[in-house]
Amino acid sequence: MAALLLLNRVSRSTSSISLHRVAGTLGFNSFNAQIHGDRISGTLFRVRSLATLAEGASHFNEMVSVNQRKYYLLGGKGGVGKTSCAASLAVKFASHGHPTIVVSTDPAHSLSDSFSQDLSGGVLKPVQGVDSPLLALEITPEIMKDEIKRQTGDKSVKNMMDSMGLGMFAGELGDLNLEDMLNAASPGIDEIAAISKVLQFMEAPEYSRFTRIVFDTAPTGHTLRLLSLPDFYDSSISKITKLKKKITAAASAFKLVFGKKEIQQKELPNELDQLKERMEKVRNVFRDVDTTEFVIVTIPTVMAINESSRLHASLRKENVPVHRLIVNQLLPQSESDCKFCSIRRKEQTRVLGLIQNDTELSGLKLIQSPLLDAEIRGVPALKFMGDLIWK
């Protein structure tokens, strides 16, 4: 309950390219040459498709043409390249004139590494090297926890219950160690912090000019908790409100018997109602086909495809719009006689066939992204990757 109320308060408050050569025989010579000197060449090397599933186009024109605000959430199994895909999309949006915010909700942040810039600290920071406004944020749960403590000050459980009109019962709850419970980090603090930022972006006037907001989400489990959190809070708030009414009625009866002072109804019900309305706004945004899209990122392995299929089923159950599937780290065709490479390409082709036959994934627009010969770090490299994926 404390987390619910504090979310309502906290969310209102303001808030060089490193290259790594791999598999030199695969014919990846062009990447280093094209991004050398922080410059992207106009001629990108071409990666042939490994299967005839789709052209591999992301239909970026439809993603960039609308001026109203759009939310894009990129997620999937850990280690598939979600951050690089999200960062490259944010750079692409900004390069096309859309003021953009990119947010990492993953507790193990790598957005700073992707942009080759320090984005830590839990505050929005401008990304260097992009013409249009591009701000980035790594959500830091520890900072939010400190903010919660700052806003609550040194209030004890007794004071908190007094504000609810239930101070007379505080002594009876001493054995529950509520003080320790409130001081401990919530298991869902990452998701609470992310939701609070979504609320800020939706409500604060200073964010109104940003027309694209990209989320680099945590691995699958965290992301599903994030998307289901508004429903969970909505249900919890309803239960808390009913419970308080029952306790207040019982306390009033206690007063009549023992002649205690009248219990005052404080601000809790109104604050809960306000939070309930705001949670409903977030829930509606996550499910709005006109403003939101979840992009699944995966790699061409059976395990990753299976998890992506389950993720899509869960997103469909939550009514979250999904239109695109990125298959990352595909080996391009090569004239090399590398036996290992040939075997891997054949296996990747087989896995792409599994997508075509998967009832959850076959209807999505397939985006094929190649395995590159370098780490994607810094804006020039992200522009290069963005031109390969988002076209």
Swiss-Prot record:
Disruption phenotype: No visible phenotype under normal growth conditions. ATP binds at K77, G78, G79, V80, G81, K82, T83, S84, N328. The keyword Hydrolase applies. InterPro entries: Anion-transp_ATPase-like_dom (IPR025723), ATPase_ArsA/GET3 (IPR016300), P-loop_NTPase (IPR027417). It catalyses: ATP + H2O = ADP + phosphate + H(+). The active site is at D106. Keywords: ATP-binding, Hydrolase, Mitochondrion, Nucleotide-binding, Transit peptide. It is found in: Mitochondrion matrix. The keyword Hydrolase applies. GO terms for cellular component: mitochondrial matrix; mitochondrion; plastid. CDD domains: ArsA. PANTHER family: ARSENICAL PUMP-DRIVING ATPASE ARSENITE-TRANSLOCATING ATPASE, ATPASE GET3C. This is ATPase GET3C. It comes from Arabidopsis thaliana (Mouse-ear cress). The lineage of its organism: Eukaryota, Viridiplantae, Streptophyta, Embryophyta, Tracheophyta. The gene is GET3C.
